[in-house]
A protein has these predicted regions:
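Hydrophobic, lipid-facing positions within transmembrane beta-strands of outer-membrane proteins
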Residues: 2, 32-36, 88-94, 109, ...
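Transmembrane beta-strands of outer-membrane beta-barrel proteins
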Residues: 2-4, 48-50, 107-113, 151, ...
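Transmembrane beta-strands of outer-membrane beta-barrel pores
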Residues: 6-12, 52-58, 98, 115-121, ...
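Surface-exposed strand-loop-strand hairpins of Gram-negative outer-membrane beta-barrel proteins
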Residues: 8-33, 141
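Outer membrane beta-barrel transmembrane domains
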Residues: 14-17, 179, 183-303
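Glycine- and aromatic-enriched membrane insertion/assembly motifs of diderm outer-membrane
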Residues: 26-59, 161-198, 207
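Short loop/turn motifs that connect adjacent beta-strands in outer-membrane beta-barrel proteins
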Residues: 45, 100-109, 123-124, 162-170, ...
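Outer-membrane pore/translocation modules
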Residues: 59-192
Length: 303
């Protein structure tokens, strides 16, 4: 199976003066991510997937003042404390299908385990480090990768309901994901442990025309991150916990695959890992997805 996602995230942020910079800090951080995925069925119950992240993050500094913390820049460029690249993490996942009722009513349960392999698009030194006079050298806070290998555990539990009524969901359940760093990056950063729980409901629209959406999805994501560390010291604002609502539409045709669009919004100051006073941060995200099952069998694999 081939699938892919495109994510556009716009973070609008501002915070009060910090250090010796006695002016308001205002800007936005725009992220464009493409994540193609290849999934291979090894048996009728086990599949292996490989996902590769590509993207760019761009900071727009919306002030005429000069700052050591912010400027117009993007993640393709190297900086004093950052390696630039368009290549992000690689993710390998192995999933086991515990239950599957096929085209009838019932449960569908996946158990998964995987490995996240970091890219070289990383920060190369602590952006929170201060000089003896409590000033900051020029630095960057963002990159595509955090430089840490991580384990990835996942549980998916969904119920399929073959209803003909539009107001009763045809698919509902949750996904629980846990990522834990296996090491520090070679530059002294240890990433947060991350728990992501996503509950979702899918309603069939019963619309017949090919251009009309076949499904309406509603979801709620819970994200929890533990403290991260730079050189053994807690990274400011790395510990977080917030809820993010989502809404989306699904379009599908039997021979052409399925296409989805989702909208997400969250207002939480922990979205950006910066030690900023009186911050006001909100995020808007659009996600486009495509999925198609290929009628191809690898000769040496007999699922």
């Amino acid at each position: 199976m081939l699938s892919g996602n495109y994510n556009f995230q716009y973070i609008d942020w501002q915070h009060a003066p910090i250090g010796n910079e006695n002016f308001e800090h205002v800007g936005n951080l725009v992220t464009n991510i493409i994540s193609p995925t290849v999934t291979i069925g090894l048996t009728n119950y086990i599949n292996l997937s490989y996902q590769q992240i590509f993207g760019i993050r761009s900071m727009n500094w919306m002030s005429d003042e000069n700052s050591n913390h912010h400027r117009d820049e993007h993640s393709l460029q190297d900086f004093l404390n950052a390696n630039g690249s368009a290549i992000g993490d690689a993710i390998f996942n192995l999933k086991y299908l515990l239950t599957n009722t096929g085209n009838t009513n019932g449960s569908r349960i996946f158990l998964g385990a995987g490995l996240v392999i970091p890219s070289n698009s990383v920060l190369t030194s602590n952006p929170f480090s201060q000089n003896d006079d409590e000033t900051y050298d020029d630095h960057r806070h963002f990159s595509l990768s955090d430089g840490c290998y991580k384990s990835n555990l996942e549980l998916q539990f969904y119920i399929k309901n073959m209803t003909k009524k539009r107001y009763i969901p045809t698919f509902y359940g949750f996904t629980l994901n846990y990522k834990s760093p296996l090491n520090e990056s070679k530059y002294g950063y240890k990433a947060s442990k991350t728990i992501v729980g996503v509950s979702s409901i899918l309603f069939a629209t019963k619309l017949k025309k090919s251009w009309q959406p076949k499904g309406l999805s509603l979801g709620l994501a819970f994200i929890n991150t533990s403290d991260a560390f730079w050189d053994g010291k807690k990274a400011p604002n790395s510990k977080s916990e917030f809820i993010m609502p989502t809404i989306g539409l699904i379009f599908s045709q039997k021979d052409k695959g399925s296409f989805s669009i989702n909208l997400k919004y969250v207002k939480d100051n922990s979205i950006l890992p910066e030690d900023a006073p009186n911050a006001n941060i909100e995020s808007f995200e659009v996600s486009l997805g495509y999925r198609k099952t290929l009628k191809y069998f690898i000769p040496w694999i007999n699922p």
